[in-house]
């Protein structure tokens, strides 16, 4: 199929996992065509449980693009284009803070492959739409939940605003993305490198009021997926701006993840949760692995870069084992087991989750490859 080799210690195992991932995704899109799942229920993608918010449609298409680019197979390319077109109307969706998650894995990859300016315009429009969520008084992009709220997750979406600012060019878009990152750095990243999920602001004055959480154990605890979003997202902010503050914050968040997580690299849903019933949040680990590979390429300290790269490899070796990979679990439709969507709402707990699938595939694809702008 023309697959690129993976010049890393993971080597053959990584290729086998990508082959398995392709088989699972092929089953998903042929069994449930034009369906965008968020998480499995009992290992099955199709169910009628709550979504909470629709933010995952780009991850399925993103995997299709990775498979198309890795294999050169027109079957994957046709489906990647199809699933990307299905979400195009959301380029003007002002109800969510997740347009980066939707359009960066899909339409941005499509543009990178073709250079077609019509495709690029969709990415730019999504970035401009996301920037409309900016609160000038508080200097933050508001979450989907409320006007006085921002989430650490949004750090993963600011890249599409930076990109739009760069391509147009538009200095106001650059200001918006930069100020949001600085606000998040100041109020959601703590002195020890841990992160809060949510920040609450006074709508009249813009003053920061308090840290909060929707998916962690407590307002002052450390939700693992949010930590992974931060180490990845601040790395991306540094990649676009060259602002050393963002690199330092990404490294601080990465160091906290590594220091607090067991040697195998997979954190629980929240490090402060006492005696968790589910000890693993595999999607946070997959995000962290991909973010650490990016960070290893960004840092100019060789020892630190090697540390991040080796830890990312440790995570991936763990996730590629039968404990986490569904390869030896008959009837399980996902790729990666033991993910958690929303523990408080009991949604997608100890299941496969679509972002966990995507970031595992992205991390494996990233091995040995330079970071992509």
What kind of region is each of these model predictions?
Residues 1-373:
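Glycan-recognition and catalytic cores of secretory/periplasmic carbohydrate-active enzymes
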């Amino acid at each position: 199929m023309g697959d690129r080799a993976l010049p890393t210690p993971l080597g053959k195992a990584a290729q086998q996992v990508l082959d398995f991932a392709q088989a699972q995704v092929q089953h998903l899109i042929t069994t449930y065509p034009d369906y965008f799942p968020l998480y499995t229920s009992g290992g099955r993608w199709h169910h009628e449980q709550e979504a909470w918010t629709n933010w995952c449609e780009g991850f399925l298409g993103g995997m299709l693009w990775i498979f198309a680019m890795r294999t050169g197979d027109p079957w994957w390319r046709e489906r990647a284009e199809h699933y990307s077109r299905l979400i195009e109307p959301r380029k003007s969706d002002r109800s969510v803070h997740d347009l980066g998650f939707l359009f960066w894995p899909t339409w941005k990859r499509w543009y990178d492959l073709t250079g077609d300016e019509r495709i690029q315009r969709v990415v730019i429009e999504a970035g401009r739409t996301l920037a409309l969520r900016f609160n000038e008084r508080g200097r933050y992009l508001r979450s989907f939940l409320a006007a006085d709220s921002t989430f650490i997750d949004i750090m993963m979406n600011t890249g599409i605003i930076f990109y739009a600012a760069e391509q147009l060019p538009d200095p106001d878009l650059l200001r918006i993305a930069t100020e949001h990152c600085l606000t998040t750095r100041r109020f959601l990243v703590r002195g020890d490198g841990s992160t809060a999920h949510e920040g609450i602001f006074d709508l009249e004055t813009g003053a920061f009021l308090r840290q909060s959480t929707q998916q962690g154990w407590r307002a002052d605890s450390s939700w693992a997926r949010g930590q992974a979003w931060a180490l990845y997202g601040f790395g991306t902010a540094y990649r676009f701006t060259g602002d050393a503050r963002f690199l330092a914050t990404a490294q601080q968040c990465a160091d906290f993840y590594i220091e607090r997580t067991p040697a195998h690299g997979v954190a629980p849903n929240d490090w402060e949760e006492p005696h968790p019933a589910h000890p693993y949040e595999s999607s946070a680990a997959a995000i962290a692995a991909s973010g650490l590979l990016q960070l290893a390429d960004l840092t100019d300290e060789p020892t630190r870069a090697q540390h991040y790269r080796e830890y990312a490899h440790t995570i991936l070796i763990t996730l590629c084992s039968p404990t986490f990979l569904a390869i030896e679990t008959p009837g399980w439709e996902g790729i990666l087991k033991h993910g958690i969507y929303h523990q408080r709402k009991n949604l997608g707990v100890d299941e496969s989750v679509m972002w966990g699938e995507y970031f595992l595939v992205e991390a494996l694809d990233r091995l040995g490859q330079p970071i992509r702008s």
